[in-house]
Amino acid sequence: MNTILKVIWNAVFNLTGLDISMSARYDDWSFYLIELRANYPVIKGLLADRHLAPKEITPGETRLHIVGCEMRKVQVAGPYHEVSIQVPVEPLEEGPNGTFTHLYLPVNTEQSRWPGVDIWGFPKFIANIDIKMENNRLVCRLAAGDQLILEFKMNDKAGSWKHYKWDYYGIRKQQIVKTTMDPEGFISDEGFDESASLVLGAHPVADTLREILLTEEVVRTIIGHKVSSILKKPVRIKMSYN
């Protein structure tokens, strides 16, 4: 069914320009986010071709988020894992939500990769993603085959009921598109967590992260359990990407 949808969606979009997709329901998932200090000029250069600019937190500094996600029940795509490597960006339109774009968005199934790329314009690729508890600590490992890209660890925490709204910019068919995700669930957002750590491997993605990061020290963590959300149908921003 997923493959049939891929063929139909691409045929209609390529022939007519009509997006026949719908918003996607995420009925049950967990996420583990670490935040790190990042080099504003370097990320600004990486995003220049997208016509996006990182949000400057302090002079010369922005943030990088690495988010391990266990997607257990997702409409159409089914269960999968992903690791979002994302940065906050300046909004192209005024709005109340935090605004981000993905530098990389590896996933571990083709059923979750193609709609992310074709419909939402996300930079998804297939990778090995292992998220598990080990000695009472959460471990998220991202690899390409046997080659480590990154691994981060943190203490798991039970949170209280919270609701967020995050906007994301993607690039689809040489156009900027925006979508909104509205996670709600038991979320712990307590700021600095000295238990969290990051290790980078020997891979081109890891090399890029080394250039981006000012330090590998984690400055903030957010953990979400029993989360549900809707990933809104993308809308095209009224500016040319050419």
Q: What is the predicted function of each stretch?
A:
Residues 35-38, 89, 202:
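Short beta-strand-to-loop capping motifs
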Residues 1-76, 80, 209-214, 219-222, ...:
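N-terminal domain-onset segments
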Residues 3, 10-15, 118-242:
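Interaction-surface and assembly-scaffold signal
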Residues 69-150:
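Aromatic- and glycine-enriched beta-alpha-beta binding-site module
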Residues 10, 39, 109-110, 203:
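Alpha-helix initiation/capping motif
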